[in-house]
Amino acid sequence: MKVIEGVVATPNARVAIAIARFNNFINDSLLQGAIDALKRIGQVADDNITVVWVPGAYELPLTARVLANTGKYDAVIALGTVIRGGTAHFEYVAGEASSGLGSVSLNTEIPVAFGVLTTESIEQAIERAGTKAGNKGAEAALTALEMINVIKAIKA
């Protein structure tokens, strides 16, 4: 029986991080968590990490697709925060970001790690950006690295 499992140490990986400016006081923590995980755990060189800032979470899928289609990156990490408010805006933005990023990954065969927080409150977002609930940016980075290796192993 052949079993394929990915590892996270990927020193030669080329990774793009697409990050939303909206709610940047939370997203900055996600970014720091992602970069720390890429460098410290994944052993990715600083020169192999590209950060692209976009206005909000809604713009992440298009940006991820353009990055994936360049052929310059082994994975894309999407980071952002969508917090529920008093209108239906949350459902539209969160839904489009989620389905759009999944579509990019399926259509390009480049891993797109989902590091977009979708929370009910600012407090929940802060918890998921490095306090009680860990750092979802770091988790997304580790997912991206593991998927790079899984896909390489499948195609080998």
Curated annotation (Swiss-Prot):
Q: What is this protein called?
A: 6,7-dimethyl-8-ribityllumazine synthase
Keywords, alphabetical: Riboflavin biosynthesis, Transferase
Annotated function: Catalyzes the formation of 6,7-dimethyl-8-ribityllumazine by condensation of 5-amino-6-(D-ribitylamino)uracil with 3,4-dihydroxy-2-butanone 4-phosphate. This is the penultimate step in the biosynthesis of riboflavin.
Recall the taxonomic lineage recorded for the source organism.
Bacteria, Pseudomonadati, Pseudomonadota, Gammaproteobacteria, Enterobacterales
Q: What is its EC number?
A: 2.5.1.78
Asked if the keyword DNA-binding belongs to this entry, the reply reads no
Catalytic site positions = 89
Q: Does the keyword Transferase apply?
A: yes
Question: Which chemical reaction does it catalyze?
Answer: (2S)-2-hydroxy-3-oxobutyl phosphate + 5-amino-6-(D-ribitylamino)uracil = 6,7-dimethyl-8-(1-D-ribityl)lumazine + phosphate + 2 H2O + H(+)
Which Gene Ontology terms describe the biological processes this protein takes part in?
riboflavin biosynthetic process
Please provide, alphabetically and separated by semicolons, the GO molecular function terms listed in this UniProt record. Answer: 6,7-dimethyl-8-ribityllumazine synthase activity
Q: Which residues bind (2S)-2-hydroxy-3-oxobutyl phosphate?
A: 86-87, 128
For this protein, the record's Gene3D superfamilies field holds: Lumazine/riboflavin synthase
- Pathway info: Cofactor biosynthesis; riboflavin biosynthesis; riboflavin from 2-hydroxy-3-oxobutyl phosphate and 5-amino-6-(D-ribitylamino)uracil: step 1/2
Query: Which organism is this entry from?
Result: Serratia proteamaculans (strain 568)
List the InterPro entries: LS, LS/RS, LS/RS_sf
Question: Which positions does UniProt annotate for 5-amino-6-(D-ribitylamino)uracil binding?
Answer: 22, 57-59, 81-83, 114
